[in-house]
Amino acid sequence: MRQFPTLIALQVFLVCARPVPGIGQSPAQRAEIERFRDSIAVITDAGALRNLETDLIAQARQDRSNAMLHLRLGFLALRLGELSDGDQARRHFDDAGSEFEWATQEQPNWPYGWYGLGFAELALGDSEIPLVSGFQMMLGKDALTRSANAFARSAEVDPGFVAGLVELSSTALRQRINARMDVALAALRRASRTPSANAPELLLARGRVERAVGSLDSSAVVLQKLLSTDSTNVLARYEMARTRFLEGDSEALGLWYGALSAGDSSALDHYREDLEILLPDSILQQFDAANGARRVELVRQFWESRDDDELHARGARLAEHYRRLDYVRRHYRLVSERRRYGIEERYRSGQSEYDDRGIIYLRHGAPDERVRYSAPGIEPNESWLYRRESGDLIFHFVAREDVQDFRLVESLFDVLSFADVLSLNDTEEMGATPRGAAVMQHTEGLLRSREPLHPIYSRLLGVGRGGASGLMTEERRLGQNAIAIGTTTDSWPLDVGEPIEVNTSLVAVGADSTGAQLQVAFAIPGEALAPREVEGGFAYPVRLRGSVIDLDGRTVARFDTTRVFRNRERIEPQRHLVGRLPVRVPAGTFTVRVALETDRGGMVTARDTIHVAPPVGNELGLSDLAVGARAVRLAWETPAGDSAWLNPTRTYRRTDPVLLYFEVSGLEQGEEYEVRLELRRPRGGSIFRRLFGGGVALRMEFDQVHPGGIDRVSRELDIGRLSSGDYSLEVRVKSDDGREVFRRQLLRVVE
């Protein structure tokens, strides 16, 4: 058989000086082992490696106590295992373990024997039988624990043995149960007093382990030490960013994106692992194919769109993701990677790292409410409630074969066995058997425990025999809907403190030569304010933030401002503090969200859709209707020098005229157009009103000659003859060539 040049070179040092027992491994011996490992790593011909193995075995028979020979045989067997499959690979890994054990018996103070044994234990793995592998983990006999013990011993006999310390740290971080994190940390801290203390891979490993045990300050110090000597170390920048995120440090964002841009392949693996649960497949595919700048653009757009939609500061959602990731890794990691599913477990995440609670937590954070029910004969179970603007989400989890593996199921009834769920349809027959009686008792206990989450559980408890089937179907549909939404979206609602009632108004009006504007107006009742006493009266700080997002998800405007209103007197509970913020926006259709906070609490509006008319061009445009009253002192000066008024409460006394302002664009100078204005009752009520759209309480029609550019129209409406109630103020503009635009504003008339 043809020999590789590398093997010819290897023959030169097959016979070596016999090591002296009890003496530490010399630098020359370590270098010799590393050269041997490097040389066989490039060989892919298993036959050539087996020939070398035969030669080494022959030498070992003549010199059985030569630890160097056994180390070579061990690393050679590992390489043969890598090039083999199935049982043959396992035999090679088993041979490697035997050779390394022999080496440790001959030279227990040499680190390489223990180091190699750690790799052999990892390669051998755990039992293929889930029950057996579970017991191995519980008893600390699993592959990760065995390998961690071996790596720990390599660091114990040589505290400065960098390779062993790095593998010990990596293995401890991978362990899902009985993690040797304390052993790894102690070994790494001992290494800080050795000549290897400043080895980059050692500092990186320690930074990770310090963070994993919660020592964020120590993690940051160690990683900063590494970065001070090598600021270009991409992995160090990535790990420092993760630590800084958990500390709430604003520097984390730049570090994280900077490391992502650098494009180091080892760091990219970490980035992808961190992001793959949330990023859609389409973005992941682009991520994999992109260069550094494009990767940053893709990921930044993903996270910032979430910041803007939920009204957080830019970068906040990314930091929250890493806080969630840290929590999930601590609390919801799977003990076993092997997962089998029952017929009632319809959702299958494809995850082997976290259970289904971890998936939901990563996407939506901590639940608003969490409920468990424990009783003999009932599987471990949890239900999580998330209160959301678009509708509450309830998730049910049950752990059957593995108490650490909670699965997401469609219905609370799926906590029971599949057969028991089917038997619930015949309550009379169930009550006649001990098993049936136990199932009914468990069902009642489960339902009572979930009553705080949703009214349907109280209804299920109160329904008569034979009437539960429809409610059970409805309850299951709620769970199916929650799974469909919860496993494909993510959320982080803005926390604005205690909820307060605030009137807000979003009016796309106020265009000038520089473009269109959105008027964000608010009216806060005095009871929702907490005044600060200042010289000369009282101060009322109000924080207002919001975002304007187009239909493709791109942010066109965002704002976050705090204004302090001063008043000589305290604002009484029945009165309002009013304010306005103009926001520059382009023409188009957008969704808008606004959050408002006072010292007493806050509120977040639902997503509202606005249409901003183009202030220039040939398209006939009509702005939103600015509607107000002099009694509500909220006006601004238009470019024409007139006053336009807003009233966020939308409530008007009959004695106060309604002040209307709107803008018409898209016509040439001198063109005529028709305006029809109606104040009518909204549809609803009697059949006549529903058919014909309600009664018109006030109508006004007039013609206008357009001045070119923007025509600013103001009218004062007398509502003194209107009866109290809700009305719709509608304005319709029609050009001579038949084009027509329409806007509506709701208002309420009171005595």
What are these regions (language model features)?
Residues 59, 102-103, 153-154, 190-192, ...:
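Canonical positions in the second alpha-helix
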Residues 62, 106, 157, 194-195, ...:
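Structural marker of alpha-solenoid helical repeat scaffolds
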Residues 66, 110, 161, 198-199, ...:
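Residue-level recognition of tetratricopeptide repeat
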Residues 175-176, 212-216, 237-491, 498-514:
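Residues within mature, well-folded domains
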Residues 35-51, 75-109, 119-153, 170, ...:
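Short coil/linker segments at helix-helix boundaries
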Residues 426-751:
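Intrinsically disordered, low-complexity terminal regions enriched in Ser/Thr/Pro/Gly
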